[in-house]
Amino acid sequence: IDSAAQTVVVRNLDTGHEFTDQWDRMILTTGGASARPALAGLQLPGIFTLRTVEDAVAIRQWIDEHHPERGVIVGGGYIGLELAEALAAHHMHITLLEATGQVLPTLDAEMAAHIQAELTAQGVDVRLDCAVEAFAGSERVREVLAGGQHIAADIVIVSVGVKPSVGLARAAGIALGPTGAVAVDDHQRTNITGIWAAGDVAEAQHLVMGRPAY
């Protein structure tokens, strides 16, 4: 993106052909990507994140090919809980690891306690205040090291949030805010005239706190 010339260089990913196009106004919606913590063993086969259709297909293929009996979900947010339900439907023993003191940390503690009770009633092993330290295995993931414990695992899904995809914005000179996402005003305008940003790439204005949020 050349904001001064108001041009953008585009590459056709099928053919490799590149061309330059012009714009009068631009809306940047490059989204975000699953956060991947810098932990040893994260690259082992059998460890997944879930953000795209391709991610879901890869998870399903692993289940069909390896028939895992023990699943570990890292993160007790909305996606983590949905995954717990989905994997339990495949008759796995599910362990859910959450680094904070409750599942769904954005909820009131009283509400979260009811949800945790239901998870436990459905056979999910919920472990709170349990931060992951590393993943272990040789040819594939075999266990998760968390809270000083060794938890056996045939499949691991890491669901610890989203990070904004700001590489293109940064290269174009678009300012990032304190959260690391693109800074915008209450009309989604960036610091560059004629460029707006929205979605997972951009901050939002917290109506109660009166400050940027992500």
Residue ranges and their predicted role:
Residues 18, 36-37, 81-82, 153, ...:
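Glycine/Thr-rich phosphate-binding loops of Rossmann-like dinucleotide-binding domains
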Residues 31, 75-80, 148, 199:
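Conserved phosphate-binding and hydrolysis motifs of nucleotide-dependent enzymes
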Residues 43-67, 139-143, 150-214:
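FAD-site-proximal beta/loop scaffold in flavoenzymes
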Residues 7-10, 15-70:
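Glycine/serine-rich phosphate-binding loop and adjoining beta1-alpha1 elements at the start
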Residues 1-10, 14, 21, 89-186:
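A Rossmann-like FAD-binding core segment of flavoenzymes
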Residues 27, 48, 72, 95-97, ...:
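Hydrophobic/aromatic beta-strand patches that form the interior of the parallel beta-sheet core
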Residues 58-107, 141:
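Rossmann-like NAD(P)H-binding beta-loop-alpha module
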Residues 32-34, 54, 78, 102, ...:
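Residue-level detector of alpha-helix initiation sites
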